Amino acid sequence: QSDIDLLFLLPYKKTAWAEAAIENTLYFLWDLGLKVGQATRSISESLLLAEKDQTITTSMLDARHLWGNEELSKSFKKSYREKLETMSSADFIQAKLDEREERQHKAGQSRYLVEPNIKNGKGGLRDLETLSWMTNFCYKCSRPDDMFKKGILNKDESTTFLKCENFLWHVRCQLHYIAKRPEEVINFNDQREMAKRLGYDDRKGLLGVERFMRHYFLIAREVGDLTRSICSILEEQQKKSIPVISKALSYFSEEKVEGFILNAGRI
């Protein structure tokens, strides 16, 4: 199960009819067993909150029309994009990368953990989402093919982004099926079943579970490469230097020591 976040968008202040309609909708979704996050706002209220709260700014970047007055939805999207033009892209990027650093500190700084966190770990889904949010804010694009058209990614990188995204979502869905509940950590005891479900058979000298985990770590590394590539573009094209981007890029720098290579403090 995953959370569903809904914004009930009002053309004016809430009326008794609107309140009843929203309440009935929520009860219906709760009866289905869904976990629903929800907010009820007018366009002006949404824009005001977006200016004050980075979490709301981010969530509204992903907003899409589901049902109701489509003209109101279009008006909201137009007004929201105009609001973004007045906000600092450097500050938004700084906030997203700060969140990424804090998240990975909690989940584990290495992408090669024995029990990786597929959502919040290094090279996980949230890293790809963070890249999409930053490019959406700065360049009005969040999908790999659009990033290619805007010159943010080359063709191979665009293909890699989509491949990584599809793989990680597939693994996450299977993980939820195996655990029979929301779960983000690929536990050691579940990895063999995961490999079997995803079609990783044993081969000479290599177990299916080993093949699966090798593939997972390869994907996580490719997500890291995408992060470096997009961050370098952002730093180059944003006029204001962003400290966290410089820090993120420095992580990938290598230093040769006699007989070894040091990469981000690791041998």
Regions found by a protein language model. Give the residues of each.
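A nucleotide- and high-energy phosphate-metabolite-utilizing enzyme signature
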Residues: 1-267
